[in-house]
Amino acid sequence: QKQMYYCFGCGAGGNVFTFLMEYENYTFVEALKYLADRAGVELPEEEYSREAKERADTRAILLEINKAAAQYYYIQLKSSRGAVGLEYFKKRKLSDETIKAFGLGYSNKYSDDLYRYLKSKGYKDDMIAKAGLISIDEKNGVYDKFWNRVMFPIMDVNSRVIGFGGRVMGDAKPKYLNSPETMIFDKSRNLYGLNRAR
């Protein structure tokens, strides 16, 4: 009747919009468009505030950057540079199909390789940094957050790459490294592989 939901286990509740925003990791506008499409309702072209448009544009760019990074890591895994990473996965009995299905990859030993690749694709430093893929400091300059690691893309329930987990090859520390929280990645709200469970 009220068209609301409530979970007695975790206390989450709301309406259809908040459900999609929580469960699907949609923005309000994405939830609205999804529901309108599903109901066959045509939405008028809306006027966004400048801030809302900038935020939506930034989210879209961060998703693009993460997708490009995941593709790059996968290609690296399949190249001669990624032999150590591929061997790691093969020792754990992961098939080529599993590696492909989960988009597993490898970040090689060069500490600015992904950065140079993303720059060649036209992405700006500030956006690559906002995606959590590089670090910038006065002493070392710009360097990749992940290098010499097997890579596990973290996807939202819509299979969009929102972050990464990496396991180092060798004895370096930290052994495991995850993306920092970003505009599109909230560690507490995402579970690795959930997109595959749907």
Please identify what each model-predicted range represents:
Residues 1, 155-158, 172:
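Short acidic-glycine loop/turn motifs at beta-strand connectors
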Residues 4, 161, 174:
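A residue-level signal for beta-strand positions that form part of recognition/binding surfaces
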Residues 18, 29-30, 83, 87, ...:
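Short, acidic loop-beta-alpha module within alpha/beta folds
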Residues 119-147, 196-198:
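Short, basic/aromatic recognition patches
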